[in-house]
Amino acid sequence: MKLEGRIAAVTGGSAGIGRGIAEAYLAEGASVAVMARNVEKAEKMLAEVGAGDRLIFIQGDAMDQASVEGFVDQTAAHFGRVDILINNAGGAGDLQPTISLSDESFDECMKWNVYSTFWGTRRALKYMTEQSWGRIINISSMEGKHGKPVLTAYTTAKHAINGMTKSVAREVGTQGITVNAICPGLVITDI
């Protein structure tokens, strides 16, 4: 198993892409902490996956700084460290033409996508720099390379994540830490 003994933390990990990532990491031998808002969905996942003490759920909201930072800290407290962070939580939010998009909707999309990625990354780096090893994987989108009508906030957020990924990768690359973004196309999920 390629990830035997590694500790992974996945935001938005109880459904969709995040659940798939969590299950793949478990299959490769990692222990995994998932953060999600929906307790019922997370408990269902825990029961269905049945990974025993290698899978834990920590309730949290990606739009709340204390939740995201607390998730990373609780993962480290439970498993002893954080080796891999997958910043997966996020979404498109309010799909409106730019002229109709409210400041509140734009800000919410930034918090859900950009700020949550920043908060998780910054906190995980605290642990990863101490151990001189880590992997941060940011789930972005093809929209982070292009643009689409009515996705102004989402496209802006994903462009920001791609820029953040490149900057942080250059900051910490000499310390045994890699930072990458994955830019999937449209994925139909149950979130």
Residue ranges and their predicted role:
Residues 126, 170-174:
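Alpha-helical segment proximal to the catalytic Tyr-Lys
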Residues 141:
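Residue(s) in the substrate-gating loop at a strand-loop-helix junction
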Residues 96-98, 102-110, 136:
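Substrate-binding pocket helix/loop in short-chain dehydrogenase/reductase
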Residues 39, 59-71, 103:
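The beta1-alpha1 cofactor-binding region of Rossmann-like NAD(H)/NADP(H)-dependent oxidoreductases
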Residues 97, 101, 147-155, 167, ...:
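Active-site loop-to-helix junction immediately N-terminal to the catalytic Tyr of the SDR YXXXK motif
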Residues 121, 157, 165:
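Active-site helix of classical SDR
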